[in-house]
């Protein structure tokens, strides 16, 4: 099977998986304490966020998806158009296909051609050489670089990598060599606290936890196996909400993706400490089912609804959501107990001295 065929398979299987998903994930175990007089005025609300020297006007981004075949090049064209029209940052799919076969360069370059002034993120794997990382950056004139780590995907992948020991030193080399921010991301299995602390030591600028709850690439790769004999890896890892809770009080900026279904999930993730929140499969499905105009409408609606939620919760900025009281339930609460995370502090933080000094209220 060629790389292009595999990329097309990934799109097809991701859409099938999204259509079959039950709709519930651990974001549903996160709720806000409703303070009925916490609301502020909509003109006082900003969606702007910043991290690692990066400033975005919105706290959401179109996360890494695809590229490398004629079909996926058209998808990237439309994703870039939607990003341009809404001001939403966008990440490429893995550019390993381009590194191996430069003839598919246009399927990635279109992300910049259609979005010349937007924030575009290149995506590579953790075995990429420094020179090839720079090639990927240069091709799309990237503003930041994602390095994806995906042992649970590689393991059932028929042609997958089986050697992972080089990843840590190679991430460190790339982070030291390139002159744009480096973000290390999982692909749907989550980053533990220990992993994020290690990434900070390696010199990366941010981590995207990309937890369980959305596209399951172990399931996708197992679906490509003749015998489907790695079904026991389906659902491997920690949820996005669990990863964010595990990362409390770590200095390295954390982004969130994985299982983000709607603006309430975005607000939940921001309240748990994410600086920005990405989504992939839901945006892809809208594009494939209804076209680029529908995706533009969806992104615009999300931004409007995010501002509405911040207004109701009394959060002038996305960062202010970390002062809102949140309650944790079910298995997510059990995870916190086992990992030594104080859930009471999260439920009572609006009345803390720091929150009072910052907001002047008990929101």
From Swiss-Prot:
Gene Ontology terms for molecular function: FMN binding; isopentenyl-diphosphate delta-isomerase activity; magnesium ion binding; NADPH binding; oxidoreductase activity
Alphabetized InterPro entries for the sequence: Aldolase_TIM, FMN-dep_DH, IPdP_isomerase
Binding site for Mg(2+): 154
Keywords of the record: Cytoplasm, Flavoprotein, FMN, Isomerase, Isoprene biosynthesis, Magnesium, Metal-binding, NADP
Chief location of this protein within or outside the cell: cytoplasm
Cofactor: Mg(2+); FMN; NADPH
Any one GO cellular component localisation term in the record: cytoplasm
Reactions listed under catalytic activity: isopentenyl diphosphate = dimethylallyl diphosphate
One Pfam entry name: FMN_dh
Coiled-coil regions listed in the entry: none
GO biological process, one term: isoprenoid biosynthetic process
UniProt subcellular location: Cytoplasm
Binding positions (substrate): 6-7, 153
Annotated binding of FMN, by residue: 64-66, 94, 123, 185, 210, 215, 259-261, 280-281
Enzyme class, broadest EC rank: isomerase
Record EC number: 5.3.3.2
Oligomer status and interactors: Homooctamer. Dimer of tetramers.
Function: Involved in the biosynthesis of isoprenoids. Catalyzes the 1,3-allylic rearrangement of the homoallylic substrate isopentenyl (IPP) to its allylic isomer, dimethylallyl diphosphate (DMAPP).
Alphabetized NCBIfam families for the sequence: IPP_isom_2 (TIGR02151)
Family membership: Belongs to the IPP isomerase type 2 family.
Stated name of the protein: Isopentenyl-diphosphate delta-isomerase
Lineage, top ranks: Bacteria, Bacillati, Actinomycetota, Actinomycetes, Kitasatosporales
